[in-house]
From Swiss-Prot:
<dbReference type="GO" id="GO:0003735">
    <property type="term" value="F:structural constituent of ribosome"/>
</dbReference>
<keyword id="KW-0687">Ribonucleoprotein</keyword>
<dbReference type="GO" id="GO:0006412">
    <property type="term" value="P:translation"/>
</dbReference>
<protein>
    <recommendedName>
        <fullName>Small ribosomal subunit protein bS16</fullName>
    </recommendedName>
</protein>
<comment type="similarity">
    <text>Belongs to the bacterial ribosomal protein bS16 family.</text>
</comment>
<dbReference type="InterPro" id="IPR023803">
    <property type="entry name" value="Ribosomal_bS16_dom_sf"/>
</dbReference>
<dbReference type="InterPro" id="IPR000307">
    <property type="entry name" value="Ribosomal_bS16"/>
</dbReference>
<dbReference type="GO" id="GO:0015935">
    <property type="term" value="C:small ribosomal subunit"/>
</dbReference>
<dbReference type="GO" id="GO:0005737">
    <property type="term" value="C:cytoplasm"/>
</dbReference>
<dbReference type="Pfam" id="PF00886">
    <property type="entry name" value="Ribosomal_S16"/>
</dbReference>
<keyword id="KW-0689">Ribosomal protein</keyword>
């Protein structure tokens, strides 16, 4: 099954996540099909906290991709910010 989930990056104690489209059997930070955005939970000041390519996310959802619980929350937050 294809999922949209977070892949962790960054360094120790400073997380940074990429929103990735991947096969659910792949490792969390392993091979992915496409990166569709990022999430920086510790963004400060003028740094961007959340960036999502809505066109690609909509495409993958229409193809049957299932977002993880956290990604679903982030997509809702991004849609609210865009409106």
């Amino acid at each position: 099954m294809v999922t949209i989930r977070l892949a962790r990056g960054g360094s120790k104690k400073r997380p940074f996540y990429h929103l990735t489209v991947t096969n659910s059997r792949n490792a969390r930070d392993g091979r992915f099909v496409e990166r569709v955005g990022f999430f920086n939970p510790i963004a400060a000041g003028a740094e961007v906290k959340l960036s999502v390519n809505q066109e690609r996310v909509t495409y993958w959802l229409s193809q049957g991709a299932q977002p993880s619980e956290r990604v679903a929350q982030l997509l809702k937050e991004a849609a609210k910010a865009a409106a």
